[in-house]
Design a protein with these regions (language model features):
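Acidic catalytic loop of the alpha/beta-hydrolase fold
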Residues: 247-251
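Conserved alpha/beta-hydrolase catalytic His-Asp/Glu region
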Residues: 157-216, 221-226, 231-234
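Conserved HGGG/HGGXW glycine-rich cap/lid loop of the alpha/beta-hydrolase fold
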Residues: 10-67
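Flexible "cap/lid" loop of the alpha/beta hydrolase fold
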Residues: 120-159
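Conserved hydrolase catalytic core segment
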Residues: 92-135
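Active-site loop/oxyanion-hole signature of alpha/beta-hydrolase fold enzymes
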Residues: 57-97
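Short beta-strand/loop motif that positions the catalytic acidic residue
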Residues: 235-236, 242-244
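Catalytic histidine-centered segment of alpha/beta-hydrolase-like enzymes
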Residues: 274-287
Length: 301
């Protein structure tokens, strides 16, 4: 994978695909690396938009193939990290497409670097101005508690030796509602399939990055609310599309509805029964979501 050095930050892994005059930056969610887009989203985007757009995927510092993160989490800083990457790659103006945390980073990029954003789309959209943000993000306390039980692994990158331990402790309780040791045999089989499906999207991420991000969600995510409150209403001339599944329990659809009220030019499309991560891994959920984005992008030509 290509890697570029960003002064004062470290190294960032990235990948180009597609062809065309425009550039769409795919911004990852949570602690997933850029392969998060490969299973379902990227094939649809390439098929529908190739010849019109190139796609830039990248790993945040601390994630995937990038170097370890040494600075505290801050969404505006992550937007600046993307700006630095674009500068290093000699890319000027872009279309932003972020999922989950990637939507927050995209929103921050709009605020800080409006002149470089041609359009914005978010899938599963955290709203840091929501009065229901704290109870929504409280789920990360359980995940952080689980990580505290494996502190000896924090300095490591996720690899095949530690992967099952991390996922079984952190994500299995969130998905199945109980500890891995309490799963039935069929549930353990489902957990195994899930681990195999998402390993490539988590490989290389520092476990310390997971710890720091979950702490940020619990204690620091609202610190930048002032910048969002002041900046987002000024984005009236930026084409925007907000996508959200009605079955999304991580970034509930009410957050996208609230953002749509704040951003009257944004179009909100809700997908019945679609979950938070379903579009990234399940073809049935991915197809309507990403085809709708392609329709939006054809309107930007």
């Amino acid at each position: 994978m290509p890697i570029v050095e960003l002064a004062g930050r470290g190294t960032v892994a990235y990948q180009w695909s597609g062809s065309g005059p425009g550039v769409i930056v795919l911004i990852n969610g949570s602690v997933f690396n850029y392969h998060q887009w490969d299973m379902q989203a990227l094939p649809i985007l390439q098929r529908e938009l190739d010849g019109r757009f190139r796609f830039l995927q990248y790993d945040y510092v601390g994630v995937g193939g990038s170097s370890a993160k040494t600075t505290p989490f801050d969404m505006i800083d992550l937007a600046d990290e993307l700006r630095d990457l674009l500068d290093a790659l000699s890319v000027e103006r872009i279309h932003l497409f972020g999922i989950s945390k990637g939507s927050m980073v995209g929103q921050a990029f709009l605020i800080s670097h409006r002149e470089r954003a041609l359009s914005f789309c978010g899938l599963g959209n955290p709203n840091v101005l929501s009065d229901r943000l704290e109870p929504t993000f409280s789920i990360f306390q359980e995940r952080l508690t689980a990580l505290e039980e494996i502190q000896d692994l924090w300095p490591e990158r996720i690899n095949r030796a530690n992967y099952a331990e991390v996922v079984n402790r952190v994500y299995v309780p969130a998905i199945f509602g109980k500890e891995y040791r309490d799963l039935t045999l069929p549930e353990r089989l489902r957990a195994l399939i899930m681990r195999r499906m998402i390993y490539r999207s988590l490989e290389g991420t520092y476990i310390q990055t997971m710890v720091d991000l979950f702490r940020f969600y619990l204690d620091g995510v609202t610190e930048g609310a002032g910048a969002y409150a002041a900046g987002l209403p000024q984005m009236r001339d930026v084409p925007m599309l907000l996508l959200n599944g009605t079955a999304d329990m991580t970034t509930p659809v009410h957050m996208s509805r609230e953002l749509a009220q704040l951003l009257p030019q944004a179009e909100l499309v809700e997908f019945e029964g679609v979950t938070h991560m379903g579009p990234m891994s399940l073809r049935k959920q991915a197809k309507p979501v990403f085809e709708r984005y392609c329709t939006f992008m054809r309107g930007q030509l």
